């Protein structure tokens, strides 16, 4: 019997997931220093400085291949960051997040073997973030 993927979201990180907690902490530091109002690329540039300071390994602008019947498609997604070699991190600078941005992260997770994703919005007075977990019933993590 095929397992149905479970999609769960959480607005808080805790000690059960120290990696996403560290990424959110770095994003909060960036937001504390820069505030809101900049373009997304400015926050990405700041993250390239902040992530190493927080001992967060990362790659920026990572191509995420998509396969169909084990054949690599010419179209691919591009994640803002992949941290700890397993967490997709997408930055936004929008007045408010919508289901479109959430779907973007979920599509990235679906196209890869990654099970965790973060959507972080810097354009509001308080930073906004949403954590996503993608996996089967036998592979849950919170």
Predicted regions and their residues:
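A short acidic/basic microdomain associated with nuclease active sites
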Residues: 52-69
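Nucleic-acid nuclease catalytic cores
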Residues: 88, 92-142
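Active-site beta-strand-loop-beta-strand hairpin of nuclease catalytic cores
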Residues: 72, 78-89
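A short, surface-exposed helix-loop junction/capping segment
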Residues: 23-32
């Amino acid at each position: 019997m095929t397992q149905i993927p479970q999609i769960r979201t959480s607005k808080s990180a805790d000690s059960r997931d120290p990696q996403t907690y560290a990424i959110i902490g770095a994003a909060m530091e960036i937001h504390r220093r820069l505030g809101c109002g900049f373009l997304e690329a400015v926050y990405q540039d700041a993250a390239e400085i902040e992530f190493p300071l927080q001992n967060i390994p990362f790659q920026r602008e990572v191509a995420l291949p998509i396969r169909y019947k084990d054949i690599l498609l010419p179209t691919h997604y591009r994640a803002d960051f992949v941290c700890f070699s397993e967490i997709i991190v997408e930055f936004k600078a929008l007045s408010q997040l919508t289901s479109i941005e959430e779907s973007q992260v979920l599509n990235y997770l679906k196209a890869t073997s990654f099970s965790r994703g973060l959507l972080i919005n810097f354009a509001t007075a308080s930073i906004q973030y949403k954590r996503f977990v993608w996996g089967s019933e036998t592979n849950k993590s919170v």
